[in-house]
């Protein structure tokens, strides 16, 4: 869904990145163990794929220069996974709608799309990085299928309502 107050930004602009780096410093100073970077797939709407890799890598470098064990978890944008610099920058990856909902709420994604995403995600598990998959099934049958396929691929799954208002 379109979340109220959620909108794309020109993440490749230095002024915007300065804001994020300032927040990263505050997060570190507060003592959090890491950050969960949502909307990493924004490059799919705006272009600038290489700039997104660079941005995530810069966030990671800044954070890890202050605390080596600080976690960087990226959500979505699995087209970035083949990039070695991106893989090096992140500690874990989360993917929404791997099996259902890519094109229409509750609709099964194409076999080709699933196969390609799984191939990319397994590049991370081969490096020992956890992969989380969040599915928003419409019914119990979809939930059951999603649990099985997520488990079969050795991913960590969450079945939830899209509103994320309950676990």
Question: How should each PLM-predicted stretch be described?
Answer:
Residues 1-167:
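Glycan-processing catalytic domains of CAZymes
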